[in-house]
Amino acid sequence: MANLFWKTKNKTISLLESPFKSEEEFEKTVFGTSELLEEITLIKRQIRGGNKAGIPDIIGIDTDGSICIIELKNKSVDASIIPQVLEYAIWAETNPDSIKSLWLELNEKPEDVEINWENPEVRILIIAPSISRSSLEFVQRINYPVDLIEIKRWIELDNQILMVNKLETEEKGYRIRPVKGLRIYDEDYYKSKRNKTSVVHFFKYISEVEKIIKSKRWNLDTKFNAQYCAFKSGFFIAFRVKWLGTKSFAFVYKIPKKDIKKFKITPTRYDELRKEFIFNIESGKTHTKDFIPLFEYCYKSIGGN
């Protein structure tokens, strides 16, 4: 069991890892921490009816419009879990109408997600306190995108510290095979979906943000999907440049309402569903450098220095 040393200005506190007491507590913690699955809209939990085998307990839709099969286990898991989640993925591919019905029943769902119900893409997420590294070899051999995510917990009085570790196939030099249906979100892709001139401006602003990140020496990676470009540190998104339509796009920041008054720039609007502020970008008029205080705030909020 791992120890965590929490060093403050006055003292160093040694914390023991605090395993989750039950599957229910583990699930409650995962779904109660919105940052962990912020790119996924949950359709329903525990949808299994009767004793039907092969139907997953937790299903969601991500910002790419992919069906997400989420498997939570409050125990160490190894490669033996792969056949089970593959069965779930096959069910999702062959029963899109069942998932579509659940999606349409949602009262609150993002309007900008495009889902191909005729030929859906499926993504698998396996979440557990500990995942055997041997699972990586099996994951890279199957034709579905798979995320292996470890979550451990430490407790100090009323505070919880969560360690989130997304296992990567590069860790031990495993040969990476292309995943079936995995899209490449480049300039050509966006031009096939959006206004071509707007796409050029979209990438111009992304380049300007990347220059700021480089000058500040921030540890952020640029990640594209169908709806936005995210600047991420590991598992967490610091900020985004997001499409609002075929022509318009915006800077997006997850900032508490009470803190937005600290900044001189007025947001265009607040997204109540996603709890984030949207600042529309006017090509040629919006200056990226004016948003540096917002970039800094959001980077520090995910633990950046």
Predicted regions and their residues:
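Charged, terminal alpha-helix-loop-beta segments
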Residues: 1-305
